[in-house]
Regions:
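Regulatory input/activation interfaces that engage signals or partners
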Residues: 1-145, 149
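PAS-family sensory/regulatory modules and their coupling/dimerization elements
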Residues: 210-263, 293-296, 300, 313-349
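Recognition helix of helix-turn-helix DNA-binding domains
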Residues: 364, 377-412, 436-437
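The N-cap/first-turn positions of alpha helices
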Residues: 366-370
């Protein structure tokens, strides 16, 4: 069962217990927590960029917030005390579609975050109940494990090459997640990620998600990296990243140093009309003296010109008291001006694949360490020395890895983890060195 079929089946089972009218379910990169591969049925697909930006731009029932909470489930109406206007997502998108409540669930385990689900309920049905939340809380751990195992199946076969020969894949977006430009090579890649509707260009949600995560990081909502690894097909993984293009500062030529002419008059040097007497030079210009005097006088009088005074700050004396500011989920976005966002798509690196492989199969830290040493060509003796364990312990770790991954030897493990058989010749030459368990 792939991840989409799994999610469809889980939702069908949920409908018998929890009533909902729409849903959004994303897989996530287990480390960065950024969403990929959405499975959704919502009434606002044309507003997808706005919805994604709002979802990432608030900590209110955010999946990363729920990961650190006592429960993996959050009910929107309960969280805001019935005042839905406090929710940014509701104000900017859901309010126009008669959404009355949202049940948010994160699916995470000790190996990472594997997805999050938002169930929407029409305002005519009434809010979600505590019983609904308890049910979702009970099933969340099992669903998290199932999602993780689904991701692990993407490593069963050696990756089929999908490299494009048309150059780098990059898109630029503004802060409202509108596509501004794209490289010519992006079309083929994006259509593989998300086949487009006829007459429309394909823009997978992963592009919007990494861009929205960058905006969230810039505004201080969440500090995870703006990147995500997504499975394309046949064991092939792509990494999607977002960054902000920086503007080069305008450089002005340094002013030429002032040439000071001096004239020796009876052993005295004149500098700008000031005489140096007894080795002491007075170089204070009249304008500087006047300016200094004005600054001192202003400080003594307790203020400056009205145009230079700092306006009162909210919550400080003379301003608006802090406790009068309404408690509302206010967006902290930067304005949609200035440098644009750039999103790149590239083949996932070997190191990133190894990390993902270890997490999806639930390897222990020591098994993960051993896998990394195998990847750089270590044999059993060298690995035992580096891990400071016996060779027998290395063999035990290998047996555990083989059992979890379904592989029968280290060559198969590495070929699946790295997505290629290249570079494994050294491992293939050591069949007797603890290669099989």
């Amino acid at each position: 069962v792939d991840a989409t079929a799994l999610r469809r089946g889980v939702l069908d089972a949920m409908r018998g217990v929890v009533e909902f009218d729409a849903f959004v379910w994303l897989l996530t990169d287990p480390v960065t927590t950024v969403g990929v591969a959405p499975f959704a049925q919502v009434p606002c697909l044309p507003e997808l960029p706005r919805l994604i930006k709002a979802k990432y731009g608030t900590g209110l029932n955010r999946w990363t917030t729920l990961m650190g909470a006592g429960s993996p489930v959050g009910l929107l109406r309960d969280t805001v005390g019935g005042a839905l206007i406090r929710s940014r997502v509701w104000r900017e998108v859901m309010s126009r579609h008669a959404v009355g409540d949202v049940a948010s669930t994160v699916f995470a385990d000790r190996f990472g975050c594997w997805g999050f689900l938002d169930l929407w309920r029409d305002d005519r049905r009434g809010p979600f109940s505590r019983a609904d939340a308890e049910f979702l809380t009970q099933v969340a751990p099992s669903v998290a494990t199932a999602l993780r195992l689904c991701q692990s199946r993407a490593f069963v076969e050696v990756a089929t090459p999908h490299r494009q020969e048309h150059g780098p894949v990059a898109l630029t977006l503004d802060d409202d997640l509108r596509i501004l430009s794209r490289t010519s090579a992006s079309k083929a890649w994006l259509e593989r990620l998300l086949p487009p509707v006829p007459s429309e260009q394909a823009v997978p949600a992963s592009v919007y998600n990494v861009a929205a995560q960058l905006l969230a990081a810039e505004s201080g909502v969440d500090d995870h990296p703006a990147s995500a690894r997504v499975h394309l097909a046949d064991g092939f993984w792509l990494t999607v990243r977002a960054a902000r293009l920086s503007e080069e500062p305008t450089r002005h030529p340094e002013p030429e140093p002032e040439v000071v002419r001096t004239a020796e008059v009876g052993g005295t040097a004149e500098v700008g009309g000031t005489a140096e007497v007894g080795g002491t030079a007075e170089l204070v210009r009249t304008a500087e003296v006047v300016r200094t005097a004005e600054v001192v006088r202003t400080a003594e009088l307790g203020g400056g010109p009205a145009s230079h005074r700092e306006p009162p700050r909210p919550g400080l004396s003379g301003g608006v008291p802090a406790d009068t500011v309404p408690s509302i989920d206010v967006p902290a976005d930067r304005p949609s001006v200035g440098p644009t966002l750039v999103v790149t798509i590239e083949e996932t690196s070997a190191a990133e694949r190894l990390e993902l492989f270890a997490r999806t199969f639930g390897l222990t830290p020591r098994e993960d360490e051993l896998l990394g040493l195998l990847a750089v060509g270590g044999d059993t003796r060298a690995i035992a020395r580096q891990m400071m364990v016996s060779e027998l312990t290395v063999q035990d770790h290998l047996k555990s890895i083989f059992g979890k991954t379904g592989a029968h030897d280290r060559v198969t493990v590495l070929s699946r983890a790295l997505g290629t058989r290249r570079g494994l010749a050294s491992a293939e030459r050591r069949p007797a060195d603890g290669d099989r368990a």
